[in-house]
Amino acid sequence: VWFDFPADPALMPALSSAIDGKPMRLAFLSSDRPEAVAAQHRLVKRYGGVSPEDAEVIVALGGDGFMLEVLHLPLARRVPIYGMNRGSVGFLMNDFSEDGLTDRITAAEHAEIHPLTMTAVDSSGQSFTAMAVN
């Protein structure tokens, strides 16, 4: 499964590399867990890596809490996220494997999420709006 938000197709080049035969532009983000950090280094060495802003897909390495953290990033609104379990729970994550990553991403089931947005006003009267993902 890979997650993304509804978006204007012109703003979301998701998985276009898989269609035109170019290497997929992947950004690898990891939680602070040692096994996640080690996996990130191995995957970058094997598949290359780009900044999250230049990625077609963000690969999140950690557990469910880290997936929720990545979903809160502003760039998550325009880049699909493929999670691999390197945490303790992993209910939202795919099984971890270093092999065939781009094929697994291309074949993954797409899950479009529609989070609620929340607006709150603090005691000084300043308004804040955020996504409610959890």
Give short role names for the model-derived ranges.
Residues 78-82:
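Proline-centered loop/turn at the N-terminus of a beta-strand
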Residues 18-48:
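Short, charged N-terminal beta->alpha structural module
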Residues 4, 8-20:
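Short, positively charged and aromatic/hydrophobic N-terminal segments
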Residues 86-89:
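Short, acidic/turn-prone active-site loops that include or flank metal/cofactor-
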Residues 65-70:
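Short glycine/serine/threonine-rich phosphate/pyrophosphate-binding segments
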Residues 91-134:
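Catalytic core of DAGKc-family lipid kinases
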Residues 47-56:
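Short acidic low-complexity segments
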